[in-house]
Swiss-Prot record:
<dbReference type="GO" id="GO:0000049">
    <property type="term" value="F:tRNA binding"/>
</dbReference>
<dbReference type="GO" id="GO:0003735">
    <property type="term" value="F:structural constituent of ribosome"/>
</dbReference>
<keyword id="KW-0687">Ribonucleoprotein</keyword>
<keyword id="KW-0820">tRNA-binding</keyword>
<comment type="similarity">
    <text>Belongs to the universal ribosomal protein uS13 family.</text>
</comment>
<dbReference type="GO" id="GO:0015935">
    <property type="term" value="C:small ribosomal subunit"/>
</dbReference>
<dbReference type="InterPro" id="IPR019980">
    <property type="entry name" value="Ribosomal_uS13_bac-type"/>
</dbReference>
<dbReference type="Pfam" id="PF00416">
    <property type="entry name" value="Ribosomal_S13"/>
</dbReference>
<dbReference type="InterPro" id="IPR010979">
    <property type="entry name" value="Ribosomal_uS13-like_H2TH"/>
</dbReference>
<dbReference type="InterPro" id="IPR027437">
    <property type="entry name" value="Rbsml_uS13_C"/>
</dbReference>
<keyword id="KW-0689">Ribosomal protein</keyword>
<keyword id="KW-0694">RNA-binding</keyword>
<dbReference type="GO" id="GO:0005829">
    <property type="term" value="C:cytosol"/>
</dbReference>
<dbReference type="GO" id="GO:0006412">
    <property type="term" value="P:translation"/>
</dbReference>
<protein>
    <recommendedName>
        <fullName>Small ribosomal subunit protein uS13</fullName>
    </recommendedName>
</protein>
<dbReference type="InterPro" id="IPR001892">
    <property type="entry name" value="Ribosomal_uS13"/>
</dbReference>
<comment type="subunit">
    <text>Part of the 30S ribosomal subunit. Forms a loose heterodimer with protein S19. Forms two bridges to the 50S subunit in the 70S ribosome.</text>
</comment>
């Protein structure tokens, strides 16, 4: 198994698919990386040489924010919004939907499991 950006990527899959196992790399970025390095799209990870794996690793480290750094940056952005006290920050703090969705009904994913109200009978 090749280890890129701290992630063991599967060896039997094509390089473009295997790179998507890294947090922060989707289909577009995976294709960009393989084109930069000059690896054919149909090549599988177990067919890569050590030099090619090193080139991929260097390209990712140089050009992209991935894995822990990306997660840290996203959480810092959310924390900054909450510290500012802006509307989006308040919605994050209250664990409600941030992007204008209705909350009277629905929004169960963000709000969590429904809490029963004591004494309410039908």
């Amino acid at each position: 198994m090749a280890r890129i950006a701290g992630v063991n990527i599967p060896t039997a899959k094509r390089v473009v698919i295997a790179l998507q196992y890294i947090h922060g790399i989707g289909p577009k970025k995976a294709e960009e990386i393989t084109e930069k390095v000059g690896i054919p799209a149909e090549r599988r990870v177990n067919q890569l040489t050590d030099a090619e794996v090193l080139q991929i690793r260097e390209a990712i480290d140089r050009d992209y924010i991935v894995e822990g750094d990306l997660r840290r940056e996203v959480s810092m952005n959310i924390k900054r919004l909450m510290d500012l006290g802006c509307y989006r920050g308040l919605r994050h703090r209250k664990q409600l939907p941030v992007r204008g969705q209705r909350t009277h009904t629905n929004a169960r994913t963000r709000k969590g499991k429904a809490k029963p109200i004591a004494g309410k009978k039908k």
